[in-house]
Amino acid sequence: IIVLAADNLMDFSLSNFYTYYRKVNGSCVCVKEVKPHELAKMGIVLMDENDRIYDFEEKPKNPKSHIGAFAVYIYKRETAKLLKDYLKEGNNPDAPGNFPAWLCRREPVYGYVFQGQCYDIGTPDAYGEVQELYRVEQE
């Protein structure tokens, strides 16, 4: 099951992401090293030498790493059944990053370090900034 946030603009290969998912045979999150000023605005992960996420904190005040998680996920079909448990525990149904944070404490979740860009364009200001970036690149 592929989940993509509708307010993201990305230029990396979903095919490569899917190939990685098949290789690790586990749920996956797109991750990448991010700039310090972006850390408080996104989920931050810690991964082991096999890219398995062992800590995932959504929008931390004191980030433990510079690896940010983006709202691009692939879940195993069996994992989708755990959404019921997640919601029964009273977790936020409107914060998609909280589910993989919860999930990585229950089963293997892997970080796919992607090449390319992924922008959150969920606010008018963010959308305008990305429009300007693309305008400059085309000149």
Name what the model sees in each region.
Residues I1-D48, K84:
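Conserved beta-loop-beta/alpha segment of the NTase-like Rossmann-fold superfamily
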Residues I2, Y18-R22, R52-E139:
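Catalytic-core segments of class I nucleotidyltransferases/pyrophosphorylases
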